[in-house]
């Protein structure tokens, strides 16, 4: 899948789940399941509940996403 097919949203982590999965509330109010991108996992970026994150969604499944950036 190319980078052009990805939809980006800002959101907030509301719950941490096992296996680096997170429940994220998007800015439009929807709640999705998201996992950490490989580069964030490699660099040991820690994500806690309440963190602002940037999430990538595919147009094929809008209920799952990938966290690509952690804000302050």
Swiss-Prot record:
- Keyword Repressor: yes or no? no
Identify the keywords attached in UniProt to this record, alphabetized. Cytoplasm, Initiation factor, Protein biosynthesis, RNA-binding, rRNA-binding
**Primary location group:** cytoplasm
- What residue stretches are annotated with the S1-like domain? 1-72
Subcellular location, in the record's words? Cytoplasm
Q: Pfam families given for it?
A: eIF-1a
Tell me which GO cellular component terms the UniProt record holds.
Answer: cytosol
PROSITE patterns recorded? S1_IF1_TYPE
Q: Recorded GO terms, molecular function?
A: ribosome binding; rRNA binding; translation initiation factor activity
Protein biosynthesis keyword on record: yes
Q: How does it assemble?
A: Component of the 30S ribosomal translation pre-initiation complex which assembles on the 30S ribosome in the order IF-2 and IF-3, IF-1 and N-formylmethionyl-tRNA(fMet); mRNA recruitment can occur at any time during PIC assembly.
Q: What does this protein do?
A: One of the essential components for the initiation of protein synthesis. Stabilizes the binding of IF-2 and IF-3 on the 30S subunit to which N-formylmethionyl-tRNA(fMet) subsequently binds. Helps modulate mRNA selection, yielding the 30S pre-initiation complex (PIC). Upon addition of the 50S ribosomal subunit IF-1, IF-2 and IF-3 are released leaving the mature 70S translation initiation complex.
Family membership: Belongs to the IF-1 family.
**Protein name per the record:** Translation initiation factor IF-1
- Specify the taxonomic lineage: Bacteria, Pseudomonadati, Pseudomonadota, Gammaproteobacteria, Thiotrichales
């Amino acid at each position: 899948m190319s980078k052009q097919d990805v939809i980006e949203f800002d959101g907030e982590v509301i719950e941490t789940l096992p296996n680096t999965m997170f429940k994220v509330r998007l800015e439009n109010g929807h709640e999705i399941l998201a996992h950490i991108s490989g580069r964030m996992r490699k660099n040991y970026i820690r994500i806690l509940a309440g963190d602002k994150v940037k999430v990538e969604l595919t147009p094929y499944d809008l209920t799952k996403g990938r966290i690509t950036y952690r804000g302050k």
